[in-house]
């Protein structure tokens, strides 16, 4: 997988408050993915290996999920996740998600558009 993170996807807008990862407790994250995508499972494994408690839901209508999440065209990828009020799109590294949660900026979330190489 190519490691060029386009995590400038701190998409401005909806101000949500978050709770930082505390006391080693696993942070819950809900991932929506296409049932036919193979790389989504690898990303879910990455999240679990980095302390996240992942719930995964297969969806045949990812376009609707992305639209309801308010994703800007061009920032989409193969899966969409929700964690503590933030939208996580694509193969965002777990450390970047943890930083987002710890710093709790007024943002929609993080995005790594496109598919991994």
Give short role names for the model-derived ranges.
Residues 8-17:
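Bacterial N-terminal signal peptides
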Residues 32-34, 57-60, 91, 113-115:
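Active-site-proximal beta-strand/loop segments in catalytic clefts of secreted hydrolases
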Residues 44-64:
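Conserved helix-turn-beta segment immediately C-terminal to the redox Cys motif
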Residues 68, 72-117:
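Thiol/selenol-based redox catalytic cores and closely related redox-interacting motifs
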Residues 1-8:
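Bacterial N-terminal signal peptides that target proteins for export
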Residues 22-50:
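Local sequence-structure signature of Cys/Sec-based thiol-disulfide redox active-site neighborhoods
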Residues 28-29, 51-54, 84-87:
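Short active-site oxyanion
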Residues 36, 43, 58-61, 93-97:
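Stable alpha-helical elements in mature extracytoplasmic
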